[in-house]
C-alpha cells in the first residue's frame, strides 16, 4: 500500500440527493409501466465566493467531485489549502473556502481548451502543453487474469447502471496477491469526467498516490480522461 499520512483535514458537508427517479412510461405496445431514470442536476462551484463553473452531475459524491475538479483544473495546489467544502442541494451550489490561495485564477481561467468527448469538457490554462513534463512510474505488471478479475469486479458491483442505465462508471484498483485486484473506489455519474474527478478527490482526501494503481472507465478514453489519469499519477488506464 502506498498510502501516506497525515491526511488533509477539510470540513465537509455530507449532502445527499436521490440518485434515481421512478417514472411512468409507455412501452412499444402502448402499455403503461414504471421504470427508473438517473437524476441529473446542476452544481455550481464557488471558490472563495467566486463562481467558477456549473457541473451537471448525478450527485452521488458531490464533495469529492468538487475537490477533484479543483485538483484536476489546478485551481487549488493542495488539499491542505482548503478549509471547507459545503454542498447545498437546495441552492444547487458548492461553497469552497480556502485557507490560503496561491493560484492566480484569472490567469489560469483566461485560456480554455475544449476537449474531446460527448460532454465537450473544458480544461483551463496550458495543461495540455505541460503534459509532456509529467513523468509516470512503470506501474504494476498486469496479467490477463488480473485484467479479467478487474472487469469482473466492476461487473458484479451493485450499480445505478443496473437499475436505470444512462450513467458511466470509473474505478481504481490495486494489485492483490498473484493475479488478484482490490477495488478501492467506484463512482458512477452521468459523465465519466465527473466520475474521474470524484475519484481524484477521494484519492486526495486519502493522500493516496496513484503510482501503483489501475484506473478503469466505461466508454472510450478521451483526451480529457487520459490527461486526468496522468495528473493523478496513475500509470495504467483500462476501458471497456
Describe each PLM feature range.
Residues 192-240:
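Feature captures the catalytic cores and cofactor-binding loops of soluble hydro-lyases/lyases
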Residues 2-186, 190:
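Intrinsically disordered, low-complexity regions enriched in acidic/Ser/Thr/Pro/Gln residues
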Amino acid at each position: 500500500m502506498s498510502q501516506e499520512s497525515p491526511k488533509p483535514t477539510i470540513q465537509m458537508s455530507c449532502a445527499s440527493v436521490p440518485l434515481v427517479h421512478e417514472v411512468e412510461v409507455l412501452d412499444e405496445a402502448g402499455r403503461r409501466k414504471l421504470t427508473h431514470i438517473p437524476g441529473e442536476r446542476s452544481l455550481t462551484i464557488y471558490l472563495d465566493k467566486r463562481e467558477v463553473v456549473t457541473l451537471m452531475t448525478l450527485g452521488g459524491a458531490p464533495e469529492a467531485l468538487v475537490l477533484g475538479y479543483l485538483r484536476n483544473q489546478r485551481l487549488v495546489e493542495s488539499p491542505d489549502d482548503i478549509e471547507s467544502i459545503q454542498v447545498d442541494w437546495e441552492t444547487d451550489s458548492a461553497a469552497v473556502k480556502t485557507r490560503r490561495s496561491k493560484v492566480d485564477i484569472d490567469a489560469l481561467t483566461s485560456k480554455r481548451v475544449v476537449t474531446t468527448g460527448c460532454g465537450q469538457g473544458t480544461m483551463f490554462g496550458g495543461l495540455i502543453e505541460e503534459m509532456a513534463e509529467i513523468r509516470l512510474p512503470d506501474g504494476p505488471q498486469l496479467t490477463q487474469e488480473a485484467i479479467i478479475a478487474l472487469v469482473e469486479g466492476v461487473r458484479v458491483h451493485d450499480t445505478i447502471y443496473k437499475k436505470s442505465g444512462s450513467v458511466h462508471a470509473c474505478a481504481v484498483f490495486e494489485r492483490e496477491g498473484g493475479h488478484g485486484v482490490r477495488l478501492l473506489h467506484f463512482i458512477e455519474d452521468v459523465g465519466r469526467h465527473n466520475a474521474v474527478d470524484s475519484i481524484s478527490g477521494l484519492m486526495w482526501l486519502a493522500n493516496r498516490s496513484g503510482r501503483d494503481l489501475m484506473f478503469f472507465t466505461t466508454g472510450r478514453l478521451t483526451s480529457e480522461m487520459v490527461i486526468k489519469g496522468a495528473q493523478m499519477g496513475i500509470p495504467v488506464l483500462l476501458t471497456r
